[in-house]
Amino acid sequence: DGELPPRVRWTDRRIAPWIASVFGIYFANGVVQITMGFLVQDRGGLEPAPAVSITALMLLANAAGAMLMQLIVGPRLGWGPRALLRAGMTLALIALTCLTLAPTLWAVAASTFAMGVASGMASPGYSAGASLAVNAREQGGIAGIINATGAITWIVAPVSATALYGWVHLSPFLVALCLVGLSCSCSWWQLRRLDVASRARE
């Protein structure tokens, strides 16, 4: 028939805890990637020209961490969405703290790689958990929300991070740390009572 599928709202109580538990890492990733060129120059004492290739390597380390987790390690772990999201957000909080305080480029690289690993756990956990939280007819609606969650933070993070970095170098990382900490707390407390499997069968 021509009946439209049911609309899924951001405020749906089946979905909202998953969104609250992940948005911090999306914002943090935007901050890290948009400020990496500045970090390389400031903490490595490099001129703009040689900093370009180092910045590319830092971003590659971040992507490598995410790919390693999603393609190789994650499937072998066999963890459910909630466990993946919690582990990813906890690691993100640790990695971002280390990146905020990193005194050398080697420390920046290690922290950036760890942020990629964290994303490689948290993002699939969120996507799977939010998808399982709704029924089959709502899958189209939830797919849009899943993709839009990251997109919205990517609109805000680059602009705000650049402005904040120009004001006080540590400020965008401190804001990101607060959001990651909030999301990490949500992943442990708000998701505690959710029965993902039963929601999917409704």
Give the location of each predicted region:
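Pair of pore-lining "gating" transmembrane helices in MFS-fold secondary transporters
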Residues: D12-V32, F113-A114
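Short amphipathic helix-loop junctions that connect adjacent transmembrane helices
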Residues: I34-I54
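Intracellular juxtamembrane helix-capping segments at the cytosolic ends
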Residues: M121-V134
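Juxtamembrane intracellular "pre-TM" segments in multi-pass secondary transporters
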Residues: D1-S21, E202
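Helix-to-loop junctions at the C-terminal end of transmembrane segments
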Residues: L68-P81, Y165
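Symmetry-related core transmembrane helices of the 12-TM Major Facilitator Superfamily/SLC fold
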Residues: P172-W189
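Loop-to-transmembrane helix entry/capping segments in MFS-fold secondary transporters
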Residues: V52, V134-I146
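Structural signature of the two symmetry-related core transmembrane helices
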Residues: A83-C98
